[in-house]
Amino acid sequence: MAQEAMEYNVDEQLEHRVAEQPVPAEVVSTQGGPPPLQPLPTEVVSSQGAPPLLQPAPAEGTSSQVGPHLLQPAAQLSVDLTEEVELLGEDRVENINPGASEEHRQPSRVNRPIPVSSLDSMNSFISGLQRLHGMLEFLRPPSDHNVGPVRSRRRRGSASRRSRTVGSQRTDSARSRAPLDAYFQVSRTQPHLPSMSQDSETRNPVSEDLQVSSSSSSDSESSAEYEEVVVQAEDTRAVVSEEQGGTAAEQEVTCVGGGETLPKQSPQKTNPLLPSVSKDDEEGDTCTICFEHWTNAGDHRLSALRCGHLFGYKCISKWLKGQARKCPQCNKKAKHSDIVVLYARTLRALDTSEHERMKSSLLKEQMLRKQAELESAQCRLQLQVLTDECSKLHSRVQDLQKLTVQHRDQISQSPSGSQARSLNCLPSSQNQRKYHFQKTFTVSPTGNCRIMTYCDALSCLVVSQPSPQASFLPGFGVKMLSTANMKSSQYVPMHGKQIRGLAFSSRSKGLLLSASLDSTVKLTSLETNTVVQTYNAGRPVWSCCWCLDESNHIYAGLVNGSILVYDLRNTSSHIQELVPQKARCPLVSLSYIPRAASAAFPYGGVLAGTLENASFWELKMGFSHWPHVLPMEPGGCVDFQTESSTRHCLVTYRPDKNHNTLRSVLMEMSYKLNDAGEPVCSCRPVQTFLGGPTCKLLTKSAIFQNPENDGSILVCTGDEASNSALLWDAGSGSLLQELQADQPVLDICPFEANHSSCLATLTEKMVHIYRWE
């Protein structure tokens, strides 16, 4: 009876444990799959001398290899599981000494006989475990997946409660292990499946300690307890491989009321063998003081100094609070107030090489386009100029053809007959009107006045003079004298040395051309009293004039007899240089004769007179010049003046050994055709006017139309001996009037003012105004 009761108790206890035992743990797959079925919790007994037993490893996958399957730890694998098991409501799992457990189980297997019914139930239980093992092997992850140790921690409510229940736990543990001891005794009689190699067992020994304990009903009301099962590999090589590069997966499984389990996977540790971030990527994220990443908020946020270098705010603040108040990178002086917080997460240097290359290409293309547009505009302007010149030349050819037909038979071959006819063509002034003195202007108290000219557009007389404040503003300029109210105006500074030539443009209002001994030619606007253009001739300039056929060109006579031609559109230098044909003497006078002004002389050009001779530079097509040397007496020339309407010129000679007095010779310009059909320009004397016996100054004369507009010509010359200006009738050669002055007359200028004809004479200090009445 006692034996049957024992068999019944064993069978009933085993069936009860199989039927009512809750699933102790849930295997959480590291790959995120569904949890597999788990075997019942069993006690694994490690024996050093016995062969390895069939052991179901809780929450551990097995290796999927060809051949019979074994419930044993996989080679070179470390499986970590967390289990929280409730055995019959009050059982607890606790790590105990494996030696004590072995001593407690050995008497149980030896002294207690196992009934046949218990063996049948054990066999069915083993077959179920084998089927479960096959399922676990199917769900096991690959063998190359490294899994680290997993710890399930259990926290006891109090240390005193464990000490009180030690005795009862050992008793209950002995009773609860009786069926399991019978199971392991029977399993020794079963045929063993081939196990893995001894080498794998040596490399991966598994030591598991399990102790089942129960407590009284009063302990069930205490706080929740957490269990910790630590599965660690004892092999040194496994530990080394785990420390070098294995990824440790730590899983915690917590039992929730009702038998449900919630997986909780801890974050994986960083693998040190992964490729690190390159230094180039970290340059924009790292503080150069602490070599840590700066942040976009907090104490270590991105900051910059005035020099532009970047640091963490906390680091650079500490740095500047120390003794070295300089930038850590460039050693520039800095202070705490120079710190500027930058609202940027990271910094990256943008590669703009392609952009800069495209930008330079764009600038080059724009420059080429502007250059092409400028060339196109210049070509259009040249086309317009050539078109106008072509039309002018066409009209000129027609006029010349008409004049040639009309005057071909009238050209005389005898100079004497031509002179007689020229004298007869100049009518004499028969009326009794003459010039009356009106006013005197003191230009310069210190003297040194030299030349004057008149501007019709501004109704003013312009006189050259030295600076009135030579100590503050040295040099020479002009003074404007208004002919409307007969009052002097302001002084306009222009040159550094004495002015030798003045001329107004007939097309530009108030634009004055001046030549000076300071080797410059200047254009001055008298409307704004400013110099608008300066040309450096390189040598002292003695005379100047405007081109009446081409308003954009001017002439400048140099001290060596050369003539420089300037284009106002070219502000750099002259465009032509006309070299003298004979002696290199200063050009004392330049006068321009326009084209087709007279039937007797239709050619245009500039008349240049030096101290030795005179030349006429004919203006050809393409703005080229052809020289014609005029037949004149050699030496002694002091002035050349022209009258454009009648083509007459006035030449003044000094007294010489053949002539005792000053002479002013009126000449007529003429031409004849050579064998090649080219014109040869010349001049012949018409009338001679005599003056005083002295001529020390380079005085200027004047030739102009009679104010009566009767076609007669008047000539006015200066006489140094009498300090006066002599007025002559060009037709009769008679002296009409003598205009007295206090000093020798240096220049003479006729002009029209207030519907009256006036004449101005210039001495070294004053200007005398005479009116025709």
Curated annotation (Swiss-Prot):
Reported modifications of this chain: Phosphorylated at Ser-46 and Ser-63 upon DNA damage by ATM or ATR. ATM phosphorylation occurs at early times upon DNA damage, while ATR is the major kinase at later times. Phosphorylation by ATM and ATR is required to stabilize p53/TP53. Part of the phosphorylation depends upon RPA2 presence.
Documented EC number(s): 2.3.2.27
Catalytic activity from the UniProt record: S-ubiquitinyl-[E2 ubiquitin-conjugating enzyme]-L-cysteine + [acceptor protein]-L-lysine = [E2 ubiquitin-conjugating enzyme]-L-cysteine + N(6)-ubiquitinyl-[acceptor protein]-L-lysine
Bias kind Basic residues: ranges: 151-164
Sequence positions bearing Phosphoserine: S47, S64
Transmembrane segments: none
Classification via InterPro entries: RFWD3, WD40/YVTN_repeat-like_dom_sf, WD40_repeat_dom_sf, WD40_RFWD3, WD40_rpt, Znf_RING, Znf_RING/FYVE/PHD
CDD domains in the record: mRING-C3HGC3_RFWD3
Biased composition (Low complexity): 50-59, 207-221
One of the protein's GO biological processes: regulation of DNA damage checkpoint
Annotated GO CC locations: cytoplasm; nucleus; PML body; site of DNA damage; site of double-strand break
Segments for region (Disordered): 18-67, 92-117, 139-230, 259-279
Intrachain S-S bonds: none
Compositional bias annotation for Polar residues: 186-205, 263-273
Pathway: Protein modification; protein ubiquitination
Keywords: Coiled coil, Cytoplasm, DNA damage, DNA repair, Metal-binding, Nucleus, Phosphoprotein, Repeat, Transferase, Ubl conjugation pathway, WD repeat, Zinc, Zinc-finger
Comment field on protein domains: The coiled coil domain may be involved in RPA2-binding.
Subunit structure: Interacts with MDM2 and p53/TP53. Binds to the RPA complex via direct interaction with RPA2. Interacts with RAD51.
Function summary: E3 ubiquitin-protein ligase required for the repair of DNA interstrand cross-links (ICL) in response to DNA damage. Plays a key role in RPA-mediated DNA damage signaling and repair. Acts by mediating ubiquitination of the RPA complex (RPA1, RPA2 and RPA3 subunits) and RAD51 at stalled replication forks, leading to remove them from DNA damage sites and promote homologous recombination. Also mediates the ubiquitination of p53/TP53 in the late response to DNA damage, and acts as a positive regulator of p53/TP53 stability, thereby regulating the G1/S DNA damage checkpoint.
Protein name as catalogued: E3 ubiquitin-protein ligase RFWD3
